[in-house]
Amino acid sequence: MPDNSTTLFLAIRASYIVFEIVIGVCAVVGNVLVIWVIKLNPSLKTTTFYFIFSLALADIAVGFLVMPLAIVISLGITIGFYSCLVMSCLLLVFTHASIMSLLAIAVDRYLRVKLTVRYRRVTTQRRIWLALGLCWVVSLLVGFTPMFGWNMKPTLESARNYSDFQCKFDSVIPMEYMVFFSFFTWILIPLLLMCALYVYIFYIIRNKLVQSFSSFKETGAFYRREFKTAKSLFLVLALFAGCWLPLSIINCVTYFKCKVPDVVLLVGILLSHANSMMNPIVYACKIQKFKETYLLIFKARVTCQPSDSLDPSSEQNSE
C-alpha cells in the first residue's frame, strides 16, 4: 500500500497533467480563433496584427507541441539524451518566439506614434516580413543553442550515469544557460526595452493629446485610438512578464543551489504556459475590432452562415 507521500506525489503529478491538457486546449482554440479573426477582418491586416499573428502562432505551438512535451518531460521517461534535448529546446524556441513577437509589436507601436506621416513608408511589406523572419530566426538560434554543445552531456558522462538517463529538463539544459543566456539576455533585457518603449509611447501620446486639445480634432482622435491600442498591447506584455518571471526566478534560485519544492516548480511551469491562452481573452475584452469579429463568427456558426466575407465596421483603434 502506497504511503501518504507517494499518494501526494501522484496526486500533484496527475493534477499537473490535467491542468496542462486544459491550458493546452484553451491555448490552441483561442489562438486559432485569433488567426481566424485576422484572416476574416480586412481592417486587421495591418503591421501590428501581422506581429500579433506571429505571437498567436507561437502560442498555438505552445499548446499543441510544448505542453505535451512538458508532460512527457515531467514523467522522467528513459529515452536517448539527444531526443530529450530536442524536446527541451523546442520548449525554449516558442518561449523566445513569443517575446520576440512582443518586442516587434512594441517597436511597431513606437514607430506608429513617432513617425506618424512617414510610418507607412517605413513599414513596407518587405520590411514586415524581414522583421517576422528575424523574430523566428533569433528564437530558433537561442532555443537550439544547447544543441551545439552547451548542454549537460559532459556532466552526465563524467558522473557515469549516462546509461540510465531519465529525461528531465534540468538533466539536459544547464542552469547557466537558463539564467544568464535565456533569462538575463533574451528575456529580461527585451522586457526592459519594451517597458521603456511603452513608457515613451505613452509620453508621446500624452504630449500630442495636450497639443491637439486646442488644435485639430482629427489629430486628437488618432492619438486617443493609439492610446487605447497601446494600453491593450501593454497589458499583453504585462501578462507575459507576470506569467514568465516567476519561473525565471525559480531557475535563478535553483542555479544558486537552493532547493525549490516540486509543487512550486510545477505551478511556475503552469503559470508560464497559461500565458498562451490569455492573449485571445485580452484581445476580445480590449480591442473592439476583435470583439466584434468574435461575435460575428459566433453568430455565423450558430446560424450556419458563411463567415468568409466578414467586414465589421468598428471604430479605428489601430492603424
Swiss-Prot record:
Disulfide-bond pairs as recorded: C84-C167
Residue ranges of the TM segments: 16-38, 50-73, 86-107, 128-149, 179-199, 233-256, 263-285
UniProt topological domain (Cytoplasmic) ranges: 39-49, 108-127, 200-232, 286-319
S-palmitoyl cysteine lipid modification positions: C304
Protein's membrane topology: Multi-pass membrane protein
InterPro entries in the record: Adeno_A3_rcpt, Adenosn_rcpt, GPCR_Rhodpsn, GPCR_Rhodpsn_7TM
Top-level taxon in the UniProt lineage: Eukaryota
UniProt keyword terms in alphabetical order: Cell membrane, Disulfide bond, G-protein coupled receptor, Glycoprotein, Lipoprotein, Membrane, Palmitate, Phosphoprotein, Receptor, Transducer, Transmembrane, Transmembrane helix
SMART domains: 7TM_GPCR_Srsx
Sequence ranges on the Extracellular membrane side: 1-15, 74-85, 150-178, 257-262
Signal peptide: none
Compartments reported by the entry: Cell membrane
One Pfam match: 7tm_1
GO cellular component, one term: synapse
Glycosylation sites: N4
Gene Ontology molecular function terms on file: G protein-coupled adenosine receptor activity
UniProt PTM comment: Phosphorylation on Ser-318 may be crucial for rapid desensitization.
Keyword field contains Oxidoreductase: no
GO terms, biological process: regulation of cell communication; regulation of signaling
SUPFAM superfamilies assigned to the protein according to its UniProt record, in alphabetical order: Family A G protein-coupled receptor-like (SSF81321)
Keyword Disulfide bond: yes
Function: Receptor for adenosine. The activity of this receptor is mediated by G proteins which inhibits adenylyl cyclase.
Family listed: Belongs to the G-protein coupled receptor 1 family.
PANTHER family per UniProt: ADENOSINE RECEPTOR A3, OLFACTORY RECEPTOR AND ADENOSINE RECEPTOR
Protein name listed in UniProt: Adenosine receptor A3
Source organism (scientific name): Oryctolagus cuniculus
The encoding gene: ADORA3
